[in-house]
Amino acid sequence: GASELSVQNASHSRTFCFIEDAVEMIVRLSEHPESVGKVLNVGNQAPEITIGNLALEIVKIMKKKMTIVPMDGPTHSPSRRCPDMRLTQQLIGYDPKNDLATGLRRTYDWYRVNI
């Protein structure tokens, strides 16, 4: 049988940004004169994915048979987090190079080797 994986707030949605892409955005923004004094988001606007579906994607990468069991989580957690990247994009014109699947795979591979 399949193992169970408990996932809090499985219906909440998020976007994710691979660290290399975040660092590249921060460096470019720090060097851009028009970014001074502005509040700018660093992240990814898409794809937006539920925490439950994210868990399913990770389980697939791990090649495990697991059943996702949704659980209640903290009530103060926002149900949706998706940054508005328009101003950052306008200033530096940067699109993240690592899509979600690549970022998850690279993170999983790193953990397998290092943890």
Describe each model-derived feature in a short phrase:
Residues 1-3, 19-20, 24, 28-41, ...:
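Glycine/proline-rich active-site loop of Rossmann-fold NAD(P)-dependent oxidoreductases
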Residues 12, 44-45, 93-94:
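Conserved donor-binding loops in enzymes that form glycosidic bonds
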Residues 9, 37-41, 49-55, 63-80, ...:
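C-terminal "lid/loop" region of Rossmann-like NAD(P)-dependent oxidoreductases
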Residues 28, 57-60, 94, 109-113:
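Residues within well-ordered alpha-helical secondary structure of globular protein domains
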Residues 6-28, 38, 50-53, 102-106:
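Substrate-positioning beta->alpha
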Residues 100-115:
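Amphipathic terminal alpha-helices
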Residues 14-20, 49, 76, 80-83, ...:
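Residue-level signal for the nucleotide or nucleotide-sugar donor/cofactor binding architecture
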